[in-house]
C-alpha cells in the first residue's frame, strides 16, 4: 500500500507557492454540492466554473487521464449529494455507472468536458 511521501508532498507545496497556484477551496466545492443537493439550477454554472477554473490538482501527467480522474471524483460526489437531496439511491448509482461507462468512450479532455456538461444538464 502506498504511503504519502512527505518529501513529494513538501515539493508539491513548494511548487504551488512558487507558481502561486492553489486547489479550489473546500468551501467552493461544497457550495456546488449543496446546490446540487437542494436542486438549485445554479449548481450547473458553479460546477462548470470549478471545472474550468484550473484550480484543481494534477492527478496524472496525461491530460486525458487527468480529466477522466476529475470526472470520476465529480460524479462520485454528485451521486452522494443527489441521494442526500432525495434522489432514489439505485437510480443515482445506476446513473453514475452509466456516466462512468460513457467516460470510457472519451478520447480527448474536451470529450470529458462535454460529458461533464451533459451530467450537469441532466434532469429527471
Regions found by a protein language model. Name each.
Residues 1-2:
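Extended, non-transmembrane interaction/recognition domains
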Amino acid at each position: 500500500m502506498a504511503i504519502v511521501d512527505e518529501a513529494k508532498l513538501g515539493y508539491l507545496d513548494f511548487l504551488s507557492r512558487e507558481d502561486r497556484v492553489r486547489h479550489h477551496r473546500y468551501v467552493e466545492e461544497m457550495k456546488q454540492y449543496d446546490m446540487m443537493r437542494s436542486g438549485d439550477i445554479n449548481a450547473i454554472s458553479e460546477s462548470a466554473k470549478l471545472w474550468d477554473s484550473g484550480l484543481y490538482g494534477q492527478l496524472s501527467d496525461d491530460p486525458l487521464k487527468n480529466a477522466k480522474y476529475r470526472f470520476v471524483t465529480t460524479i462520485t460526489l454528485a451521486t452522494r449529494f443527489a441521494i442526500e437531496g432525495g434522489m432514489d439511491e439505485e437510480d443515482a448509482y445506476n446513473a453514475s455507472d452509466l456516466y462512468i461507462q460513457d467516460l470510457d468512450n472519451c478520447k480527448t479532455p474536451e470529450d470529458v468536458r462535454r460529458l461533464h456538461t451533459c451530467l450537469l444538464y441532466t434532469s429527471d
